[in-house]
Amino acid sequence: KELTETIDCFFTGGYKLATREYKGNAPESWLYWEDEKTGEKFNENKYRDYYFGEGLAPITKGYYYGWASSLEIGLMKDGKVVPIGYLSGLTDEIKANPLDYKYKVIEVGAMELTEDGKLRHGKMLGFRDDKDYMECSLEQLK
């Protein structure tokens, strides 16, 4: 179902941790590396060592810092939290401290609502400090 209006929902406190493997196209300028034998992490350009087979692997920034990669969002129904998906593309502050944002109300846009009740391509548009999470009803999706 196509969504034409924004939704007010909240962060549930659930999140997914960042993946390890860096899949970018520019490892020669990348700053986050891990020694594959010892697990030691480096925040400096180690491309030369990587290129010459020194056992280093580029890792994602989120993995380096132990951040969340996406946070779960939800709505309320009959006093219970109903998860409606995960949001990525969040600020470093939010990803670094996901539990600090539990129950914070946000305005979200999305391409559509899937058949199983999840948002597809959700995007955070901003915080709604004027609302309590209990006001974020599943009824918005009908």
Placement of each model-derived feature along the sequence:
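Nucleic-acid 5′ end/cap handling module spanning
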Residues: K1-M111, G122-R128
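C-terminal accessory nucleic-acid interaction domains of nucleic acid-metabolism proteins
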Residues: M111-K142
